[in-house]
Amino acid sequence: MYRQTAADLSTARADPRSATLARYLNELLGRAHNHVYIGAPTGARGILYFFTQRFPQVFRETWRYTAAAVLVFAAGAALGVLLSVTDPAFERFILGVDMIDTIDKREMWTHSIVAVKPLASSGIMTNNIAVSFATFAGGILGGVGTLYAMAMNGLLIGVVAFSCARSGLGLSLFSFVAPHGSLELPSLFIAGGAGFLLGRGVLFPGRLSRRDSLLIAGRQAVRLLLGVVPLLVIAGIIEGFVSPTDLAVPFKFLIGASLFVLLALYLLAAGRRSGATLATSLTTDSES
């Protein structure tokens, strides 16, 4: 509401006929500023507030950018499948000879994780966080770097999925991915959305200076990126200790589905009460 009112103020200022409205909106924003930016919790309470309130709120405010990341990833995956179907050499080029040979033998390459669970889990966490940060950072190039990262990640997933399905390992692959992928993939999409949000700030500043536009978009984007770090840590633990085990396939899918539902509820519902309280407070101020 605060950001929308600020945008309305910018529009009103650009129209000389809306001078009275501009003054009213400016006064309203001045009173609302303290409610929005003053008195935020700090320390441990601040961290708790961020993850229980602010992060899901920012996700809902910027969900279109995450949706764009999902679409780019899906397009990359579809392209990966299409190119693998039409050109077997492409499949070998992307995955490499050793991995193709392993898949052709109907062997999963993931079982080696079991022997080194703690080390593997740590490496997975580090890699996933690094990939998410790189995907986000690509947004500074007007979103081009983020676009490339999301498309290439999707393409790789598409090629792997096709290769495994071709060799009868589709169920093995998806049952491996399900437990941790339910958190890891949404985290990647949110990081991609953060990158696109950053790119929007660079390319489309509107009436703001490019510096101010990037600053505003960057704050929101960083919040999105920081919010997925714990999700990636949890996903790394699951990928190292649960996904590669011999746990029954239905249980793996159940774990994945349960985690995804919990994540969706968290992102869609958490922080709504405090947001409603702020809106009520702002409305009361504007009427006084």
For every predicted segment, state its role.
Residues 41, 45-62, 111, 115, ...:
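Cytosolic juxtamembrane amphipathic/interface segments immediately preceding
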Residues 71-85, 141, 183:
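Hydrophobic alpha-helical membrane-insertion segments
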Residues 81-106:
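Interfacial/capping segments of alpha-helical transmembrane domains
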Residues 116-145:
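Individual transmembrane alpha-helix segments
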Residues 137-288:
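Generic detector of multi-pass transmembrane helix bundles and their immediately adjacent loops
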